[in-house]
Amino acid sequence: MPFIDSFCGKICDECEEKNNKQCGGCMASNGSSSLEACEIAECAKAKGKRFCGECEHIPCDIITRYAYDQERGDNGARIIRCKEQKARLVQEARVGVNPVSFCGHHCDFCFYAEWCGGCRSSYNCCSFATLFDGSTCPNVRCANGKNLKGCYECADLYDCDKGYYGRVNEYIAKATALFIKKHGEDCYTMTLKRAIEAGEDYPKTFDASGSVASALAILEGYIQP
């Protein structure tokens, strides 16, 4: 799939404006074509998104209005195209990448997996990371600084409150890191998969347990010899 050549997902080569040589394309002109200013282009640029598919709010009111406009709309085709392109970017970024994140979260089972390639990938869109400078999670920065594969290799893990480990009422990240430290990554992946198949809601069930120790105990309850 070629990369989308417009912010909204419309195919430029099929656009009547480009065919009439009135427009060079919104991406080619950075949203400043010879036509009227485009609010979609301005919105995407303001949010630092290459196209609407990278925005967590798709389909928003703006793109929906354009997609279903009676004169220039395409009955929502551009929205579907944006989502397909986003999915392709995530899929390509995750090829050959370890799905176990630095903090212990598992990207294969993360609710954000359809939007993010993972913190080890070249397409890291982690919503937590965006809260920090350079969109780099403190756990990732610290582990890389110590040349560690992940927080689970750190001697300071038990008392650490950096990044995810300092979030109130969220225990799953440290619990899974402790699990990996004790049992290894392969056991973690198989055990978490088993827990989810048994009906555990990852990460909600574990966070609702009330503590790191309780979350860890739930996960360890699914270990098989």
State each model region's role.
Residues 1-225:
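Cysteine-centered metal-binding/redox modules
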